[in-house]
């Protein structure tokens, strides 16, 4: 199955022999016809992956904080089990992980290549990374505020969402920004194995056909996307930071 997947992922590359004298820039069909869709594919992969990774990672992070030492409901067994799984998944290199998850990807979306299929491994491999960021952010919340909420009779659910998440929101937004930027890089790497988007375009045309204009354009596009994401993240983080008011 893995051999078939890699063969499919490199099929486009085999059909793109390096051609001397290819049209460049605005005369290059790769840029005029495929550049825009490739950007949209990258944004789609990153957007969907970020949303699902944030949901799953936040829940895992809350479990780690609540069951850890000094948490609302300490449970060493649960904490160690969740922490072990998180560490195992985090240790997997993305390219290896995306190949290992081929059966699950095909089961969920019906195919193992393309931008939509890439979302599955992106979410699974990045959610544990975000879970650790959430854990770090929540552990940084002043314990005095948690104790004050407990003294006022707040439930664990109210403390989780009304104290921990609320107080850590600026840091959480910065962590979401970091996650989204990381996923941009992951989605580009996925292009090497048929993942679609700017990464696959850079491989197929920029590398295999030695079209420097395509390579430069994809790199610039990724840089611009990253800068915009970082800018939005910084603005949102400042807006929700009640300490800066």
Where are these predicted regions, by residue range?
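C-terminal transmembrane helix and the adjacent membrane-cytosol boundary/short C-terminal tail
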Residues: 63-69, 216-245
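Cytoplasmic-entry segments and transmembrane alpha-helices of multi-pass inner-membrane transporters
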Residues: 63-101, 122, 133-136
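Short helix-to-coil transition segments within interhelical loops
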Residues: 138-168, 208
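Short, strongly hydrophobic alpha-helical membrane anchors
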Residues: 1-37
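Transmembrane alpha-helix signature in integral membrane proteins
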Residues: 35-66
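Transmembrane alpha-helices
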Residues: 156-187
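Non-cytoplasmic
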Residues: 104, 175-225, 231-234
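Loop-to-helix entry region at the N-terminal start of transmembrane alpha-helices
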Residues: 37-45, 90, 94-129, 214-218
């Amino acid at each position: 199955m893995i051999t078939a997947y890699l063969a499919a992922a490199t099929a486009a590359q085999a059909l793109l022999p390096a051609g001397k004298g290819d049209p460049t820039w605005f005369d290059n069909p790769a840029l005029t016809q495929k550049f825009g869709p490739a950007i949209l594919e990258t944004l789609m992969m990153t957007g969907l992956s970020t949303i699902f990774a944030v949901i799953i990672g936040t829940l895992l992070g809350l479990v780690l904080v609540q069951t850890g030492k000094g948490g609302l409901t300490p449970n060493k067994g649960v904490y160690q089990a969740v922490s072990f799984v998180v560490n195992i998944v985090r240790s997997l290199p993305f390219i290896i992980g995306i190949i290992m998850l081929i059966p699950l990807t095909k089961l969920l979306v019906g195919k193992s290549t393309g931008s939509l299929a890439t979302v599955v491994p992106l979410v699974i491999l990045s959610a544990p990374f975000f879970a650790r960021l959430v854990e770090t952010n929540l552990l940084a919340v002043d314990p005095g505020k948690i104790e004050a909420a407990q003294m006022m009779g707040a439930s664990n659910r109210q403390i989780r969402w009304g104290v921990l998440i609320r107080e850590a929101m600026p840091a959480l937004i910065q962590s979401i920004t970091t996650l989204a930027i990381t996923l941009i890089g992951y989605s580009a790497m996925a292009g090497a194995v048929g993942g679609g988007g700017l990464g696959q375009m850079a491989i197929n045309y920029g590398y295999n056909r030695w079209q420097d204009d395509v390579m430069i354009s994809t790199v610039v596009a990724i840089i611009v996307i990253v800068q915009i994401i970082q800018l939005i993240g910084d603005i949102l983080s400042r807006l929700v930071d009640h300490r800066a008011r």
